[in-house]
Amino acid sequence: MAVGKNKRLSKGKKGLKKKAQDPFARKDWYGIKAPAPFAIRDVGKTLVNRTTGLKNANDALKGRIVEVSLADLQKDEDHAFRKVKLRVDEVQGKNCLTNFHGLDFTSDKLRSLVRKWQTLIEANVTVQTTDHYLLRLFAIAFTKRRPNQIKKTTYAASSQIRAIRKKMTEIIQREASSCTLQQLTSKLIPEVIGREIEKATQGIYPLQNVHIRKVKLLKAPKFDLGALMALHGESSTDDAGQKVEREFKETVLESV
């Protein structure tokens, strides 16, 4: 018999598995609230690690950007091809108050618009709203056949393209720079600017599928809690108690 250490007997409990911890046990759910221009205010929920020590959950949530379909926000399937970006600016209790951060088209919608025998015209404009939000708006338009046209193609001349692009830029500049971000969002939802461009360019060349395909937020002003609360239909002084006036009654001592 060999003299020495029996390796099998001295084997420790290395093979035992550690107790699995649920990662969601250390997390909390927060509701996301959309701003006033949208019909549906409850967007959904987001996860965040619970506040521990110096790590605050509110700090982790602020600045978080969520992408939502406009169809869900407006309860209308006609807007399904448009995506809205919302940015979390403030956390109130278990609710994240958001503001508009951008707009975009789905790639399948953009691809479906591009067809043969027509001219694609694009324009982009950098504008500043009256409440000092710097935005870049991207517009897209396509030429269409004139009434009673026999020719198959609807190609616009270079001079016509330049004239249409100039008109598009003017309309976007006028519509966006004369309103607040909230008012601009209200214009973007029903495609007001697109219809305005279509109407204004009829004399140059008839257009179809005129859209503001993308809105990019370049710069936001200094954060204002009061403005955000007003956007969500709330007041920053809601938590303050109300002064109650009571009738003064003099206390009479029965015995001294």
UniProtKB/Swiss-Prot annotation:
PROSITE patterns: RIBOSOMAL_S3AE. Residues 1-20 are annotated as: Disordered. GO terms for biological process: translation. The keyword Transmembrane helix does not apply. Residues 1-18 have a biased composition (Basic residues). The keyword Ribonucleoprotein applies. One of its GO terms (molecular function) is structural constituent of ribosome. Keywords: Acetylation, Cytoplasm, Ribonucleoprotein, Ribosomal protein. GO terms for cellular component: cytosolic small ribosomal subunit. It is found in: Cytoplasm. HAMAP family: Ribosomal_eS1_euk. Belongs to the eukaryotic ribosomal protein eS1 family. PANTHER family: 40S RIBOSOMAL PROTEIN S3A. Component of the small ribosomal subunit. Mature ribosomes consist of a small (40S) and a large (60S) subunit. The 40S subunit contains about 33 different proteins and 1 molecule of RNA (18S). The 60S subunit contains about 49 different proteins and 3 molecules of RNA (25S, 5.8S and 5S). This is Small ribosomal subunit protein eS1. It comes from Podospora anserina (strain S / ATCC MYA-4624 / DSM 980 / FGSC 10383) (Pleurage anserina).
